[in-house]
Amino acid sequence: MKRDYYEVLGVSRSADKDEIKKAYRKLALKYHPDKNPDNKDAEDHFKEVNEAYEVLSNDDKRRRYDQFGHAGVGSSAASGGGGGQYGGGADFSDIFSAFNDMFGGGGGGSQRRRAASGIPGVDLKIRLKLTLEEIAKGVEKTIKIKKQVPCKECNGSGSKTGATETCPTCHGAGEVRQASKTMFGQFVNIAACPTCGGEGRIVKDRCPSCYGEGIKQGEVTVKVNVPAGVQEGNYLTLRGQGNSGPRGGAPGDLIVMIEEKPHELFVRNGDDVIYSLAVSFPDLVLGTKVDVPTLEGAVKLTIPAGTQPETMLRIPGHGIGHLRGSGKGDQYVRVNVYVPKELTQQDKDLLRDLRKSPSIAPEAHSAGGAKSFFEKARDIFG
């Protein structure tokens, strides 16, 4: 099973392009085949890093991945763009430009990263249970969630008066650097400023309500638009709907994990559904029409004369809407024979008379005989 691309690069879901590129450079250098000859594990990691970067560095692919996971980008990540030995289509100039960040000389090093306005909020994960009917058509759900919200007393600034001052340690950069000489040249270590936590500014007159954090626990209502065809384990990402960041930091994302409620009538198979129908022996022999429940209401189904037990009958277009593209799956009705446990004496006499008829005797079993239910299901669904 593929790992989450954000996990592969070691970044949060709210990471910007610069953070993603920086993480990619570091990992690509670590696992590059030139540095790890004849190392299959490193080669696999290198491929995985390139695949993750190709998706997360592309706005459209990242949007689809955030909404639908690996299913949203299909196999494009593994086969796109580059066409080289390791696939992916990543820009390898990103790897080699990283040397300017690590060693002195050359172009004089990378530009100083400016501190962000506050610390980004933490992503929030919730679980949303859906019925099969909701999944079949898609649904808009209004839900209440508890999360970190901006403090009303200080408007999220963390300061009682709203005043802040430039950090005296990093002078507003949000980071500190320490240079050291090695056999490869000058090595520069970059870390978040320990004084301001990477914000570049320090709060004055801390708010007594939020203790200077700028955020408090609250409850909000959000709307989630769920497309048709989602499956258990899929997730939707609502950008900026997660926890608010401390002291005006950008909010994190709300990750909605999809759960599918068990259905009392139907079993799901991809975008198709299966319904089991019990039919009397006379109706199987003579044929009949019956009302069959579907996800959209009851429909008439014809049971042909001579239908065998465990036959699968198809009702086109009564399954689940496709996640990508138009159309729906189908509903399959598995026909089983109903065997009553209690009979009147008259019923028993009729069955005894019927049993004497040679026309209802079962055919001799042979290698080419009737297929089992599992064989029929395999033929239908692959």
Swiss-Prot record:
Q: Which residues form the J domain?
A: 4-69
Zinc finger region(s), CR-type:
138-219
Instruction: Tell me which GO cellular component terms the UniProt record holds.
Output: cytoplasm
Q: Which UniProt keywords apply?
A: Chaperone, Cytoplasm, DNA replication, Metal-binding, Repeat, Stress response, Zinc, Zinc-finger
Would I find Metal-binding among this entry's keywords?
A: yes
Where is Zn(2+) 1 annotated to bind? 151, 154, 207, 210
Q: Where does this chain mainly localize?
A: cytoplasm
Q: Which residues bind Zn(2+) 2?
A: 167, 170, 193, 196
Q: How is the cofactor bound?
A: Binds 2 Zn(2+) ions per monomer.
Concerning InterPro entries, the annotation shows: DnaJ (IPR012724), DnaJ_C (IPR002939), DnaJ_domain (IPR001623), DnaJ_domain_CS (IPR018253), HSP40/DnaJ_pept-bd (IPR008971), HSP_DnaJ_Cys-rich_dom (IPR001305), HSP_DnaJ_Cys-rich_dom_sf (IPR036410), J_dom_sf (IPR036869)
Gene Ontology annotations of biological process type: chaperone cofactor-dependent protein refolding; DNA replication; protein refolding; response to heat
Q: Which cofactor does it need?
A: Zn(2+)
Q: Annotated Gene Ontology MF terms? A: ATP binding; heat shock protein binding; unfolded protein binding; zinc ion binding
* Compartment(s) where it occurs, according to its Swiss-Prot or TrEMBL record: Cytoplasm
- CXXCXGXG motif repeat positions: 151-158, 167-174, 193-200, 207-214
Q: Which Gene3D superfamilies match?
A: DnaJ domain, Heat shock protein DnaJ, cysteine-rich domain, Urease metallochaperone UreE, N-terminal domain
Question: What is this protein's function?
Answer: Participates actively in the response to hyperosmotic and heat shock by preventing the aggregation of stress-denatured proteins and by disaggregating proteins, also in an autonomous, DnaK-independent fashion. Unfolded proteins bind initially to DnaJ; upon interaction with the DnaJ-bound protein, DnaK hydrolyzes its bound ATP, resulting in the formation of a stable complex. GrpE releases ADP from DnaK; ATP binding to DnaK triggers the release of the substrate protein, thus completing the reaction cycle.
Record's comment describing the protein's domains: The J domain is necessary and sufficient to stimulate DnaK ATPase activity. Zinc center 1 plays an important role in the autonomous, DnaK-independent chaperone activity of DnaJ. Zinc center 2 is essential for interaction with DnaK and for DnaJ activity.
Family according to the record:
Belongs to the DnaJ family.
PANTHER family in alphabetical order: CHAPERONE PROTEIN DNAJ, DNAJ HOMOLOG 1, MITOCHONDRIAL-RELATED
Q: What does the record note on quaternary structure?
A: Homodimer.
Q: What is this protein called?
A: Chaperone protein DnaJ
> What lineage is on file?
Bacteria, Pseudomonadati, Chlorobiota, Chlorobiia, Chlorobiales
Q: Which gene encodes it?
A: dnaJ
